[in-house]
Amino acid sequence: MNVKTKAAVIADEFTLLSVASIWDVCSLNRLNAIDQLKAFCPDLLFIESTWNGADGSWSNENRITSQLPLIQSLTEFCNQNNIPTVFWNKEDPVHFVDFSIRAKLTALFDIVFTTEVDCIARYKALLAHERVYFLPFFANTQTFYPKDLKRQSGYCFAGSWYEKYHERNNDFLHLYGLIKNSGASVNIFDRNHQKNIEGRTFPAEFQQSIVGNLPYTEIDKAYSGYETGISLNIVKNGQTMFARRAVELLASGTAVVSNYTRAMRVLFGELVDTVSLYDDKIHRTSCDTSER
């Protein structure tokens, strides 16, 4: 009988659901995190670069970057009780400064993981130790696998529009235009659909393709329900940083088309069709059934 690792976790919903079937998880709420930690007595404290937390208690002014004394109390309890502490920055290099320099969070942990190998040397220099490692996004194959569903032709995108990331937006506009000009359909599951969040509303040219939203607990229906999925990346020049949806789509047996980034070529090679602003067509539109 395999005994699951008991992990006290502060993470956003996507990561929490990814590890929930792997670990015995206690998701720490900001309001009573210390009491939860003591009562649960975990084998591991795992905290990621969190923006909301699975329950929303770590959002806005209460983000972990503003909760240094509380995070320090958690790590001190773990140190006193020989419980290893791990921090994962899942958004390197974009938010390296936010979590490691401004908030000084990473210095509190025994081990630091990063999604970008090019940041490892920076962490080691900053922290003055060698316990820094690469941890990429991963797919939980209990959730993401090729399902026996009738796949819709065309493309799906499940995610957000970020007004501030101009290069990503230009890539999406170009990719979207290529798809539409080919006669194929695009269905967009907008993570912020009807939330009216400033800077998160898709421009007018995308509105005809928006079909609503799916909670992350149901996103596998989209990833397994289409011939092809669209992935978009913010980081263009990193060796290993990519959007989580790429690996979840691949695990679902779905063809992936993405904006061109260094990491997509380094890690996935020909598995993913990468399209740059210089391309005038999409090279592959679906997986062969035998590849799923």
What are these regions (language model features)?
Residues 90-103, 138-141:
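Nucleotide-sugar donor phosphate/pyrophosphate-binding loop at the beta->alpha transition
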Residues 1-40, 49-58, 66-70, 111-270:
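Nucleotide-sugar donor-binding catalytic core of glycosyltransferases
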Residues 100-110, 223:
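A conserved, positively charged/aromatic
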Residues 68-81, 104-105, 178:
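Catalytic-core regions built around general acid/base machinery
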Residues 287-292:
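A charged, aromatic-enriched C-terminal amphipathic alpha-helix characteristic of glycosyltransferases
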Residues 43-44, 60:
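Secondary-structure boundary/capping micro-motif
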Residues 4, 78-89:
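Short beta-strand/loop segments at the ligand-binding rim of alpha/beta enzyme cores
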